[in-house]
Structure formats: structure tokens, C-alpha cells
Curated annotation (Swiss-Prot):
Quaternary structure (record): Part of the 50S ribosomal subunit.
CDD domains: Ribosomal_L22 (cd00336)
Lineage: Bacteria, Bacillati, Bacillota, Bacilli, Bacillales
Organism: Staphylococcus saprophyticus subsp. saprophyticus (strain ATCC 15305 / DSM 20229 / NCIMB 8711 / NCTC 7292 / S-41)
The name this protein goes by in its record: Large ribosomal subunit protein uL22
HAMAP family: Ribosomal_uL22_B
Protein origin, superkingdom: Bacteria
Pfam families: Ribosomal_L22 (PF00237)
Length: 117
């Protein structure tokens, strides 16, 4: 059984979020939370909050024991890009892309559910 949580349009570039997600993928929930609390990255608090949400979803929606859960999937896709311009010399302007992320975390208890035929 698995439960997931999704955060959309987070104002951190997906490349930076993936650095943190790579650290917690495959870890137990408790270990992942400990890693996120100690990691000094801008995306750590956001990912930690999302992981807590996934754990709460698992407990509330599926009556799963949060102590047994592992982070099965953790990925960040690109969200909409905010396009801005910075004035430059001689009347020119440079484009600035402010990237956003859609972050998804899936937690699982390791047990496969019976598939309906």
C-alpha cells in the first residue's frame, strides 16, 4: 500500500530540489526526517513538510503504521517558469527565468496490495 503527497509550483528550481530528494529516496520515514532536519539547503524544510504530509495521508487515509513506512518515490518535475527581465547596458535587457517545481513524495509499507482482475 502506498500514499503520496504533491506540492505544486514551489519557488525553488527542480535541480536544487533533486539534490535533497536524492538523499531521502529509499530511506525509512524516520531516517529521512532526520536527514532533512540536518541538511542546510533551502528546499529541505519544503521537502520535510511534504514528507510529513505524505505520512499523515498514509495514516489517515489508509490506516498505515508510520513507523514502518519507507520513501518509495521522490521526484521533482518542472513547474511553470516565471519570466523576468534585467536591464543591461545600452538599452538592452537579459531574460531571467525563475523556475518552479512540482514535488511528489510516495511512501510505502513494502506490502503489495492485491490487484483486482
Amino acid at each position: 500500500m502506498e500514499a503520496k503527497a504533491v506540492a505544486k509550483t514551489i519557488r525553488i528550481a527542480p535541480r536544487k530540489v533533486r539534490l535533497v530528494l536524492d538523499l531521502i529516496r529509499g530511506k525509512s520515514a524516520g531516517e529521512a526526517i532526520a536527514i532533512l532536519k540536518l541538511k542546510n539547503k533551502a528546499s529541505s524544510p519544503v521537502v520535510e513538510k511534504l514528507l510529513m504530509s505524505a505520512l499523515a495521508n498514509a495514516e489517515h487515509n489508509y490506516d498505515m503504521n508510520t513507523d514502518e513506512l519507507i520513501v518509495k518515490e521522490a521526484y521533482a518535475n518542472e513547474g511553470p517558469t516565471l519570466k523576468r527581465f534585467r536591464p543591461r547596458a545600452q538599452g538592452r535587457a537579459s531574460a531571467i527565468n525563475k523556475r518552479t517545481s512540482h514535488i511528489t513524495i510516495v511512501v510505502s509499507d513494502g506490502k503489495e496490495e492485491a490487484k483486482e482482475a
